[in-house]
Amino acid sequence: MIARVEIEGLDRTGKDTLVGYVDYMSGRMIPVGSRGLMSTIAYAEVFNRFMSTELTNKLLEANKETLVVYLTADRKDLELRHKISHHEPIDFDKHEKAFEYAKRIILGSDVLFFEFNTSKQTPYQIAEMVCTIIEEENKK
């Protein structure tokens, strides 16, 4: 059962855009937001904030009915998105490693996780797939 959807990823991967698409295309039947479980774990790594195993496990348990949608983008595309939007510079390597760390933790749990590359797929295509995942999972 999926009770909510969290859209995750580095800055400028298209999280907020996808939130709107999934919210609308799912008929607003399920809460959709950005920056949740995965960002909590990843940014604890980026900013050297200690997260105990106990806290991590409690977060994973609390998110058992969450669909985590992790958005990535090709590096050159991501760099261009940052540049043309005048976004503050980030250490791409550090942030990508932190999100990959969070991904490994989530994949080792019961939390449903899917990854999409926004350099390769449009928001509409991704939202269609996410809505299909929600429908299929909630039929079980």
PLM regions: where:
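Hydrophobic anchor at the beta1->P-loop junction of P-loop NTPases
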Residues: I7
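P-loop (Walker A) phosphate-binding loop of NTP-binding proteins
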Residues: L10
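NTP-dependent small-molecule kinase module
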Residues: I84-H87, E100-K140
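Walker A/P-loop
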Residues: D16
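Glycine-rich phosphate-binding loop used to anchor ATP phosphates in small-molecule kinases
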Residues: Y24-N63, Y70
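A glycine- and Lys/Arg-enriched "phosphate-lid" helix/loop adjacent to the NTP-binding pocket
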Residues: K58-I105
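ATP-binding Walker
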Residues: T13
